[in-house]
Amino acid sequence: MPSNSKRSMAPPTNVSKQISATSTSKKAPTKPTTQNSIAGAKSTGSPETRTSSPEHMESPETPTATTTVNRKKQKRRQKQAARLAAERQSSNMPAQNGDGGHDIVADFSRAATQGQHAAFDNDDLDYTDDETHYSTQGQRGLQHDKNGVLHQSQEPSKRKGKKKKNRKSRSQSHQAEGSSTSMSTPSASLARPVTLPPLSSSAYRSAHKVTKDRIWNTSTHEERERIKEFWLQLGEEERRSLVKVEKEAVLRKMKEQQKHSCSCTVCGRKRTAIEEELEVLYDAYYEELEQYANHKQGSFENGAPIGAPPRLYQPPLRTLDRHSHHPVAQHPSRGRVQELPDDDEDLDDDYDEDDEDDEPYSEDELEDAARTTRADFFAFGNSLTVKDGILTVADDLLKNDGKHFIDMMEQLAERRMQREEDTQYAAASAAHQSMHAGHNHGPPLDEEEYDDEEEEDYDSQDDEEYEEDEMDAMTEEQRMEEGRRMFQIFAARMFEQRVLTAYREKIARERQERLIEELEEENRLDVEREAKKAREAQKRKDKKKLQKQAKEEERAKREAERAAEEAAQKALEEKRLEEQRRKKEEQRKKREAEKKAQEEERQRKEAERQKRLKEERERQAEFERKQREQKEREKKKREEAKKREREEKEAKERELREKKIKEERERREREEKARQEKEAAAKAERESREKAKREEQAAQQAAAQAAAVQAAKRASQSGPTHLPPGLQHPQGPSALQSPHFQVATPVVPKAPTPIRPRQPSQQGSHASSPRSQPAHVDISQTSSLSPGSVSTTIPGKGVSQAPLLHHPQPSAPLSPLGGVGRGSHTLGFSPMQSLNGLPTNPGTIPAMGPRMPMAHDMSMYTNHSGPLGGQYRGFASPDSIPLPPGITGPRHLGQGRGFQMEVGHTSLPFHPQPNAAGPISAAAPQSSQNSGASLTHTRQPSISFERNQHETQPQSQPISRPAPIQRPASTVPHDQHKDESKTNQQEIDELSTQLGSSALLDDSDIPLTAPPSQPLSSALPPGLPGAGRIGFAGPSLFSDHLGSSKPHFSLGAPGSGAGWAHNPFGSPGFPAAPSWGPSSGAGWPTNAFGILGGSHRAHTSRPVAIRLSVIQACKQLNTTSGTDSSGYHNVNQILRQVEQLNSPNESQIGLDEMLDICDTEGNPQNGGGSFIIKNEGPKGTFVKFEPDNNSISSSTRGSVVPGDIGSPVPGSSLPTPGSGSRQFATTNISPTTGF
């Protein structure tokens, strides 16, 4: 091992190196750049600058050196130093690279005179010595080619003048060295940093169109500025990633190169040492690079160049050829790193520039320099190329896939291993030689040619004249430091490649974005251009259109002028054309004759065609008629099937009804028997009371006779006085008999009016109406009601007042009961506490019982519009105050003398106690005896009220046949009474049909005799008395007196077992109630209230009910739609109307079911008429109802349209209690049969 004393020889070497580098940096002015740039320097210095290359290839020795020194090189260095000193003195310009070159020259002067290490004691000076040259000079000649690869921008004028010398120098170098691996010939496997993919030619063509844009400007200065800005914009993490990406790549490359190397232990240790050395070197390099980046940030922003990071060590760098026995002191060439492009053309241009560099030296000197560089890998002599006075080191490391770099790292590993062994063995030099003699093999090289040339170089070195020169061997530490320095140069080179690659990627992205924007701009311009062309074309069209219009107007004007001229000419030629007209007239007549003949022929053909069409229509009509007849036959078949089904159903119902009637008859017989027994007991009691009454009457008659005597005396003096019919004296005992049951309810007195009321007729009044009543009742009948009969009910009240002999209204006859019950205050009577034992409600009308319980707690009085008490005739309002017209609630019931209530308009069914004493029970025997004698022979009341059109009882009929005298109901058998009532009813109906609206018929009108014209009562099944269609409106033509008995509805005495019917309000009548008195057979009419709330179609089959509802819905829609309607209605609208008419408790009707029923043929049972169904596709299906003779609209009951003859007055309908949505409707379409 050489001792450390040999280090004293290093300063001159470094000083000379610095002189060379300083002179190079001064003579070759460069611009500031960043460390992102790549070495591609362009020299502009003088020929003296090129002398640095030979100087760097040799290492001078001081005179005190023990080894021999190459005198030629020493002389050359002395000459170069003298020239540099002269140039420094003559140069007044400061260094332009900003790397402290002036300080380096000063330090070199001091080092030359003093022989010290001043230049190497300053890190900054040492940094600016190599890396600054490398980084600052690298970007001067950079330009991008079309593929994104940098190349040197050479001046064309220099290339032509330098080609010859460059080729000559290159041939001499080949002859001297015999190597193909120098930097003059690039390897095929040159390791280069990753570059961006080339842009397309179209992109570059579009890029060259906008050369003024900054993105496409490729000038070196602006590009360096952009690289600087790019580096400043990078964050800490991005910078770190750019730096640290090299370590793994180098290690991976090392492993790939050493795959086929020796597998001995020494080589394995060597590989491990190489990896460890790389780890240490990269870690130190990364740390210093980060520190330097942070330290140089300010100078970078101010425009100062950024070079490689400061070196870890700055010892004097000397090389020692360990493979040669003749060591020669060599100095590793250092300078700015320069990138060599891949293409051969650029390489030739580089060599053109190199011609100028070799001028100051002779060919022999270059050959000597080439030979001396083969001594050791650390000398890098065989791979260094002179480029404008700049030695490329990193390019050599990249050649041959980094083989030189790997060799360098192996050398470092060997040195490291040697140091480890030297610590163990003292003999450093001998051990070193012996160890490497046995293991002097490295990884196989990729190119055999290179190996051969290397061996030739080494062999030639042994035979050269340098054998006599002794190289001063460097210490191991110096060799290691030199290797580290070379590694730093390599790492800086690779780092710059990474930064430049990132910058190129950014520029490529920006260019691509700009290209996209330009393409979009071109597209937009194309669209605008097309739109502009379209507008211009439209303008041209409009212009042509205007021109054409102007031409048309001008042409029309010319034609008008021409027409005027022609008219003038025609006027002139009129005479000339007269003869021609005559000729034409003859010809025209001839043509007309021909035309007439043709017309006749055409008419004949047309007649034939019409005839054929008519026959075709007839055939079509016949076909349609047959189809219609077939359809009608099918309908008839269906109707017959339905009719048979209905008849079977009716037969079953009839049998069921007959069974019920039989059971009811047996029950009634039992009840009648029980009632007769009760009546016998009541008769005995009544006889005892009548005996007491007769005794009292005898006393009263005595007093009355006395008064009559006095009155006769006064009458004989004053003459006879005419009394009203109501106050005449009874003619005999028969006058006390009443044909009706006497109800103890006073008649509501009429309000006095200023005009004279109509005097009731006394002649023929008994025969004027079937329902007329006796015109007068003897006053003595009133006297028959003794106060004693009332005293049992009203104890403590005196009733011995004289009978009222003057009626408030002379024309109105008195009630048969006289003043009893006319008012609670008129005769001093207090309000009746009970009626035959029934308790009365306080505050209600006198002599009226409390509300009776009804089914489902239903209200007895519906729709009260006035105070209770004025609703019914014979029940006076409180204090006998008459109610004004129109505020009487339900209509007043027309009722005659004797309180005969009309069936169907009767008042409340009372339940009197059987043994209660009262004024009504006193007259019970007489009413029970003669009730059937004059039942219907009563006077029609003078008052009138609006009656429903469906009630068949004539109102105020002036002419009517009186009913025949009948036996009392109690003595007439049930069947006989029913037959007589039916006969009487038919006679009355015959009489009624000749009056009313029938009298308005014309002689030509055919009266309809369809079953709907029959009274409603005839449609009821046997056993059901006639029921009115509205509550309290039973048929009034039934002459049922109060004692008549009907099955299911007799009102017998208490305990008779009479109860409600099967349907409380669905069938006529109320439950049987005890009679007013003990008389047998006495009771309310069986259908006192008629059908209360029940549906009038309770027993109608569902198809018939649905058809009737559809008919009614069509009529209502016709009424609401007006006269312009065609009568067709949408089926959905009809269905909604039918649902409104139906009761909620009825089952839902479907659309298909309704349409099927509309296809059925009409008959008197289902409403008649026919339906026309029309299907209009998307509009829907429409139905029209056409009535016929069987339809309800042509019956005597009329239609439901207000205003027709026989239609009800809208305010005359009385609602009836009960369930169902149609209980208040004037339903007149129910069939009389078909239950």
From Swiss-Prot:
GO cellular component terms attached to this protein's record: cytoplasm
Coiled coil listed as a keyword: yes
Coiled coil (residue ranges): 502-714
Region feature (Disordered): 1-210, 300-369, 416-480, 517-848, 904-987, 1001-1023, 1186-1235
Keywords: Coiled coil, Cytoplasm, Stress response
InterPro entries: Fungal_stress_NST1, NST1
Compositionally skewed regions (Acidic residues) per UniProt: 340-367, 445-475
Residue ranges with Basic and acidic residues bias: 517-539, 549-697
Biased composition (Polar residues): 1-19, 35-52, 759-772, 779-794, 831-843, 924-959, 1188-1198, 1222-1235
Biological function: May act as a negative regulator of salt tolerance.
Protein name, UniProt field: Stress response protein NST1
Source species of the chain: Coccidioides immitis (strain RS)
Gene: NST1
